[in-house]
Regions:
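Extended, compositionally biased accessory segments flanking or bridging domains
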Residues: 1-95, 102
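Intrinsically disordered, low-complexity segments enriched in charged and polar residues
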Residues: 66-78, 106, 123, 133-135, ...
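Alpha-helical bundle protein-protein interaction modules that mediate dimerization/oligomerization
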Residues: 91-99, 126-132
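Short basic/glycine-enriched coil/helix segment immediately N-terminal to the Walker B
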Residues: 99-107
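Sensor-1/coupling segment of RecA-like P-loop NTPase cores
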Residues: 107-126, 130-168
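Conserved AAA+ ATPase "SRH/arginine-finger" region at the nucleotide-binding site
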Residues: 160-178, 182
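Extended amphipathic alpha-helical coiled-coil/heptad-repeat regions
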Residues: 183-189
Length: 189
């Protein structure tokens, strides 16, 4: 949960988490999609992640990047008719198992739901997702804005499984640190 106006800092944090040279050891997938509909969102997010996996498997990587092919194929037929979120949960459980089995790492799926208009449907979809079993090493994250929270009640209802994090994003302090770092680099040149 971030303060209003800190959206660009959150985007910068996402970029940091996804950077190849980041010290982040856990697997992180950022899903940048607005919620579409309860019936289509699972297929949308699974398709989005399938595309990311395909990019990873087929892209050229710097020599210093340890490459391991991701052997996972999206299964759009794993849907339970009564639960619209089942396709996403089942696929993400399988992908998590494939990526982090036998390690102490986590596999995180972070939903950046910018430009979502149907938050009622979105909350219902996440409610259905939370009713399904999650892989023990899988974590889901949703960004929200303080005082405009769309998921506060959902988080409270699932307080044993969910936690709200209020990161201390200090844009002014960050700018001061960048300026100080730049000044120090200029002195050393």
């Amino acid at each position: 949960v971030i303060n209003p106006g800190d959206e660009s800092m959150l985007d910068a944090f996402y970029d940091y988490m996804l950077a190849l040279d980041s010290e982040e050891e856990d697997m992180v997938f950022l899903i940048e999609l607005p919620f579409s509909s309860r019936t289509d969102f699972s297929k949308d997010v699974v398709g989005y992640i399938a595309q990311q996996v395909e990019y990873w498997n087929n892209s050229k990587k710097p020599e210093d990047i340890v490459f391991e092919r991701v052997d996972w194929i999206a299964d759009y037929k794993s849907e339970e008719a009564e639960n619209d979120a089942s396709v996403a949960v089942a696929n993400f459980n399988k992908l998590t198992e494939s990526l982090v089995k036998g390690t102490d790492m986590k596999c995180s799926f972070v939903f950046n739901l910018k430009n979502t208009y149907d938050y009622d449907g979105c909350r219902e979809w996440f409610e259905k997702a939370l009713a399904l079993p999650f892989h023990k090493q899988m974590v889901w994250g949703i960004s929200d804005i303080k005082d405009y929270e769309q998921f506060g009640k959902l988080m409270a209802k699932h307080s044993n499984d969910a936690v709200s994090i209020y990161p201390p994003i200090d844009l002014d302090g960050a700018m001061e640190q960048l300026a100080e770092q730049a000044a120090n680099e200029d002195k050393s040149d």
